[in-house]
Amino acid sequence: MTVLQTTRKEAGLKGVRIFESVVKAVIWRFAREFRRIASPLSSKRRKPTRANGNAAFPNRIFIAGCARSGTTLTQRLMGCFADTFVHPPEARHAMLNMLDRPESNLVVKRASRSYAHLAKLPASTGLIYCVRHPFDVLTSSHPQTRALRRFHVTAERWLAEYDALLQLKKAQPDRQVLYVRYEDMVGEPDVVQDRIARSFGLAPRIRFSEDPANPIRKTSLRKWERNAEFLTYLSSLPPAFLARVERFCGEFGYDMPANPGDKVANRLAP
C-alpha cells in the first residue's frame, strides 16, 4: 500500500469517526430533550398558575409602553409574584419563547424599539401596557440620554408608541390588555398588584408596597405643573401633536390644560 493510499484510508476513517460522533451527539441531545418534556417533574414545574389550554406551556407576560411610563418599575415589581421569572434585560416579545425556565410564569419587558412589532404580539402572550400622563413622560430625563438632549422621550418617540398601541388594537380587537397607570402604581401599588394577580392568575409572594429592593416614590408625579421650564417646553409643541396627546389623555383618564403656556403665565405673574 502506498503512502498516498494509507493517507486516504486514514482520512476516511477519521471522517467516519467524526460523523459517528456527530450522530451520537444529536441522538443524545434529542433523548435528553424528550426525557425533559416527558418527565412528570417537568410537567409539574411547567404547569401554569392559570388555565391556558395546555399545561406544558408557561404563562408568558409581556410588558410594553412608552419609555418613562413605569415599564421598568413594573418589570422589577413582577418579581414579587411567586413562581415567576423576570428576564432582566429588555428584549422583544420573541424572547418569551426562547426562555427555558422551570417557573410557571415568564415576564419580559419590551426593548426600546419593540413598539414597531407590538401589533404582532402572539395572542397567547399576556400584555401589561404601562401608561403615564404624557406631560410627565415628555419632561422626564434619563441618565443614558442626558448628555444628548434635555428630555429622554421626544415627541416623535411618544407618538410612535401611541400609534403602535392603536395598531395593536386594530389588528387584535379582541385582545385583553391590562393597562397600568403609573400614577396608580405609585399611589396604590398593592391594588395594582391585585389587578395583575387576577388578570394572569398569579400568587403574590410579597406585596408591592413592601418590596425593599424597589421603593416606590411619589415625588415624580406631575412635576411639569410645578416647573416653568417644563411648561414652556410643552407649550412649544405643535398643536397637531398636542391634539393627539389630548386624545390619549381622554382615553386613559388624564386631565390636560387647554394651553400649558397659561400655567407659565400664572407662575410668573406677581
Regions found by a protein language model. Name each.
Residues R60-F62, S104-K109, V177-L178:
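Residue-level preference for the first positions of well-ordered beta-strands
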Residues I63-Q75:
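Glycine-rich phosphate-binding P-loop
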Residues C80-S114:
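Conserved substrate/cofactor phosphate-moiety recognition/catalytic segment
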